[in-house]
Amino acid sequence: MKRTYESGDKMIHTRGKAEGLREKLATILSQDYKELAVQDLKVIGTGVQNIVFRGDSEKGSLAFRVPWEREVENINEDLFNSRISLKKEAELSKYCHSKGISVPKIHGLHLSAELDFLISDCVYTDHMPISAHKIGELVSKLHNMPIDGLHYEQNIKEPISKYIAERIVKRIEGFNTITNCGIKLPDTKTIEHILSTTDDEKCLLHMDIRPANLIGYNGEVKAIIDWDNALIGHPLLDLMRIAETNEISWDEFKDGYKNDSIFNVTPHIVSLFYRLDTAVMLANLFIAHLKIKNKGVFYKERVKALHQEIYKNL
């Protein structure tokens, strides 16, 4: 869930909408999932795309992830399809669970005209902070996980360098529209050529590692959640997102990740483009969607600084 990105008491979706979804969920569970005997549905998390309810059941506490809408327009991406998102969450969580990566166990995926939702274990937290070192260890384990048996079809153009190049250009176009900055990048083909040096190394990337998406207990990571942004690609793409988002101590994280060589074998300009991909996404999010002024200003300046740095390294 993307709770961290919401501003103070500002609610993107109304309580009325949440109650309507809760009632629909309760009705379907009472009719189609009688064996679970789910009771006492309560909201435990709200994000940009989903709301999560907790309910007591015959299998213990369960979490129900319910999209706010089936499709959503997004300045940073193509049309967001929540059904694809739920399928992705279910598939990647099941695979990671089978490989010993900490994720909630998936119990079911319900898709219907009335409502879509994902059923998983409800993992509890004591809200004790998780050290960046431990997060680094976890991400290293994820990046080193074999993906030969992962039959996940990324809904993107191949190779990954083409997809990221096109995404950066699209995001910059949106950024220029809302800021009037007039940022100019090399053409898509040039960016793709620069990024293509990393196409051969592939692993599963979470692409949104931050405290809001890590459930911890007693300082240990109990579960990674929210695989909406996940990709298969070079680990540096995931690492630069973590660095640019800056919600985790970078030096401490790297100590836990234990692979400094990854930053030396890849051309610096690749890292800059990967950082730009995240910075412009956050600028667009905070300026146009969430309207959080100080963060919008910060990432607007980051985009401009990264743009200058990229041209110095071309």
Question: Model segments located where?
Answer:
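Juxta-kinase regulatory segment immediately upstream of eukaryotic protein kinase catalytic domains
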Residues: 2-40
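Conserved catalytic motifs of the protein kinase core domain
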Residues: 59, 115, 200-202, 220
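Active-site Asp-x-Gly
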Residues: 203-204, 210-211, 215-268
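An alpha-helical support segment within catalytic cores of ATP-dependent transferases
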Residues: 20-36, 145-207, 305-306
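Active-site activation/catalytic loop segments of kinase-like enzymes and analogous catalytic loops
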Residues: 236-263, 275-294, 302-309
